[in-house]
Swiss-Prot record:
One of its GO terms (biological process) is DNA biosynthetic process. GO terms for molecular function: ATP binding; thymidine kinase activity. It is found in: Cytoplasm. It holds the Pfam family TK. The active site is at E89. ATP binds at S9, A10, M11, N12, A13, G14, K15, T16, D88, E89, A90, Q91. GO terms for cellular component: cytosol. It comes from Xanthomonas euvesicatoria pv. vesicatoria (strain 85-10). It catalyses: thymidine + ATP = dTMP + ADP + H(+). It comes from the Bacteria. This is Thymidine kinase.
């Protein structure tokens, strides 16, 4: 039975790597997939989904007003049977788009796998994540680690000096240089202005020894 899945985490937990591995697993079995990626995230190039460890694949761009059920139906009409839809950066979906993806599952009987952040740099839910948490059939946390050694569940936006940024737009595309995953306790600490966090992390992919 097809289901709507939401795989969520803080930053740098390997969400896109997991998405690309899932897509590969389908293709390896002769099944066709469709990867959707938001237009506003063009860090790897327009329509390219890329992980920090060097994996990449082409995706279909969507915008806030894209009708996703219709997009999927057109894809099937043009290219034939579709076995799975995968959505990168799913936190950027709108409420209506999450509902449309649920229709892909319920009406078209195609599983939809969404990968994204749960909360923003203020600790508040993104719109897409809010409704995926409400409507998905299956929820799974992709875990990552805070510098303190605890599980990281929050994401902090930092400035060049490692201090928390508490103002600004919810959506601001950036990678390791702007965002750091931390535990809830560390999130509270840095948001109070107690200390700083080094935003620099080891560059990936790592060189082969």
């Amino acid at each position: 039975m097809a289901k709507l899945y939401f795989y969520y985490s803080a930053m740098n937990a390997g969400k896109t790597t997991t998405l690309l591995q899932s897509a590969h697993n389908y293709r390896e079995r002769g099944m066709r997939t469709l990867i959707l990626t938001p237009k506003l995230d063009h860090r790897a190039g327009s329509g390219v989904v890329a992980s920090r460890i060097g994996l990449r694949a082409d995706g279909r761009i969507f915008e806030r007003d894209t009708e996703l059920q219709q997009l999927v139906e057109r894809d099937i009409h043009n290219d034939g049977a579709l076995h799975c839809v995968l959505v990168d950066e799913a936190q950027f979906l709108g409420r209506a788009q999450v509902w449309q993806l649920s229709e892909v599952v319920d009406r078209l009987r195609i599983p939809v796998l969404c990968y994204g952040l749960r909360t923003d740099f203020r600790g508040e839910l993104f719109e897409g994540s809010q409704f995926l948490l409400a409507w998905a059939d299956e929820l799974e946390e992709i875990k990552t680690i805070c510098h303190s050694g605890s599980k990281a569940t929050m994401t902090v936006r930092v400035d060049a000096h490692g201090h928390a940024v508490q103002d600004g737009p919810q959506v601001e595309i950036g990678g390791n240089e702007r965002y750091v995953s931390v535990s809830r306790a560390e999130f509270k600490k840095i948001m109070r202005g107690e200390g700083r966090i080094d935003p620099l992390q080891i560059a990936l992919p790592l060189p082969v020894a």
